[in-house]
């Protein structure tokens, strides 16, 4: 039992009377306590003896106390509407990342397809030899790296509490576990160099750069902990899955010596993400009432309108994809100005350098504006009555609470939806790649515009996304 009887009875009453059921321990709380442990606790094996004391030596209460330290003390009522949205978004981001339903298979598939099937072609301006750059940085091929990540994750996903109690299996791994599977010893060393660190190393990293209580960047960077000798264990399987998805990109990025090379890598990754999204939606819309058009071009000058258009009956969904990563500082520091500036930079842009929603609104004005309508090559838009602007982000921020409403609020300063009358332009919708992957399964039987309209009808502010609805 983790709690004193009087505490346990109160918790049981609270849990039994709550709907939906409440939990005592949750992922972010556990990661937060682990973070404090590596930062401030002594590296002493005798500490483990405390677990044999009654009520875990008080650790249960420490977990409950951790809950009070996970939230930012930001005055809410005195803020503007935009600032209130940012405050809710800051809290939602950490909830989404820790509690959100994340598909392991989607992460594996997305990582593999972006790397192996949909990179920019060799010889194009966006091409970057990520295979060679990653091998130079890590000593591994991308295939070896992904296979080793999947192997470790599979071990932990198959592990049961009963196996651990019966000592039929263990949360601890050794280098021998890999070599028994036929993996070359040098490859194992290279892999563990990338994904693991000792508690002392993690402490140094967190003490050097830590943007707030919810910042688990270093656990994501090194999701496997090295303890005594060559014993290893994964701190968190979701961090391992995130490493599988983005580890190759960041290991390569951190090895590059110039900003020019890093810019080329980011451009390559953005094109790979766009190619992946177009493939996903093309497959989802095939033989359905949704007609999918990737990379549509203006008839007059051949420039790209937006990343894709989907015609759903008399509706048109204009899509823009953004592969940018939102910085840890902006997501976890609690600084409203930092988060606003990052969203402005990555998802909005300026009139001279448009990003995200500025690209979408400009495309809609160009095609449907009363005084500047421009034909789109090979797409008949004459029967379109309603236009849906949809932004898709590779970063999870696209699924956080309030992001659609926040982007709409910002768009109102440079885009008047009434200027497109008699056609109707809906407010802006925003989804993460995880969100669009989820709804793509329904496009064979349902119009995309109907799904978006249903979202709007039930939640006119579009505060809840398809991901946050499941956790908040």
Residue map of PLM features:
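Long, charged/polar, low-complexity intrinsically disordered N-terminal extensions
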Residues: 1-68
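Interfaces and regulatory segments of ATP-dependent nucleotide/adenylate/phosphodiester-chemistry enzymes
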Residues: 6, 12, 67, 71-284, ...
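Conserved catalytic cores of phosphodiester-cleaving nucleases, focusing on short active-site segments
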Residues: 281, 308-310, 317-323
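A short acidic/basic microdomain associated with nuclease active sites
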Residues: 284-311
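A short acidic (Asp/Glu
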Residues: 304-306, 396-405
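Catalytic cores of nucleic-acid endonucleases
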Residues: 323-387
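Short secondary-structure boundary/capping segments
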Residues: 333-337, 403-410
């Amino acid at each position: 039992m983790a709690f004193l009887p009087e505490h346990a009875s109160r918790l049981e009453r609270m849990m039994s009377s709550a709907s939906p059921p409440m939990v005592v321990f949750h992922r972010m709380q556990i990661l937060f306590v682990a973070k404090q442990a590596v930062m401030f606790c002594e590296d002493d094996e005798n500490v483990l003896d405390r677990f044999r004391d009654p009520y875990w030596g008080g650790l249960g209460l420490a977990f409950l106390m951790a809950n009070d330290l996970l939230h930012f003390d930001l005055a809410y009522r005195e803020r503007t509407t935009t600032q209130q949205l940012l405050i809710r978004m800051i809290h939602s981001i950490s909830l989404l990342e820790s509690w959100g339903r994340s598909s392991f298979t989607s992460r594996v598939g997305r990582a593999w397809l972006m790397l192996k099937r949909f990179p920019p072609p060799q010889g194009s301006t966006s091409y970057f030899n990520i295979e060679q750059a990653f091998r130079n940085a890590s000593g591994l091929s991308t295939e070896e790296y992904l296979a080793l990540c999947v192997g470790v994750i599979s071990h932990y996903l198959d592990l049961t509490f009963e196996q651990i109690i019966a000592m039929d299996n263990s949360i601890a791994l050794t280098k021998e576990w890999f070599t028994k599977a036929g993996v070359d010893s040098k490859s194992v060393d290279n892999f563990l160099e990338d994904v693991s660190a000792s508690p002392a190393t993690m402490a140094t990293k967190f003490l050097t750069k830590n943007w707030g209580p919810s910042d688990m960047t270093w656990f994501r960077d090194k999701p496997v902990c090295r303890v005594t000798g060559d014993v290893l264990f994964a701190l968190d399987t979701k961090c391992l899955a995130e490493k599988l998805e983005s580890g190759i990109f960041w290991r390569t990025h951190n090895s590059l010596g110039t900003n020019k090379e890093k810019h080329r890598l980011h451009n390559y990754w953005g094109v790979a993400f766009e190619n992946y999204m177009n493939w996903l939606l093309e497959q989802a819309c095939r033989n359905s009432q949704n007609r999918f058009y990737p990379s549509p071009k203006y008839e007059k000058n051949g420039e790209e309108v937006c990343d894709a258009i989907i015609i759903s009956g008399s509706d048109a969904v204009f899509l823009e994809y953004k592969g940018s990563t939102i910085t840890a500082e902006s997501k976890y520091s609690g600084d409203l100005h930092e988060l606003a500036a990052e969203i402005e930079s990555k998802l909005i842009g300026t009139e001279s350098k448009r990003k995200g929603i500025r690209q979408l609104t400009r495309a809609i004005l160009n095609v449907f504006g009363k005084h500047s309508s421009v034909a789109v090559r090979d797409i008949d838009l004459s029967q379109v009555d309603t236009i849906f602007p949809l932004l898709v982000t590779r970063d999870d921020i696209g699924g956080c609470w309030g992001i659609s409403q926040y982007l709409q609020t910002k768009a109102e300063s440079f885009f008047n939806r009434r200027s497109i009358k008699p056609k109707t332009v809906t407010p802006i919708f925003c989804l993460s790649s995880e969100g669009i992957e989820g709804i793509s399964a329904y496009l064979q039987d349902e119009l995309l515009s109907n799904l978006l309209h249903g979202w709007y009808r039930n939640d006119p502010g579009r505060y809840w996304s398809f991901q946050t609805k499941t956790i908040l």
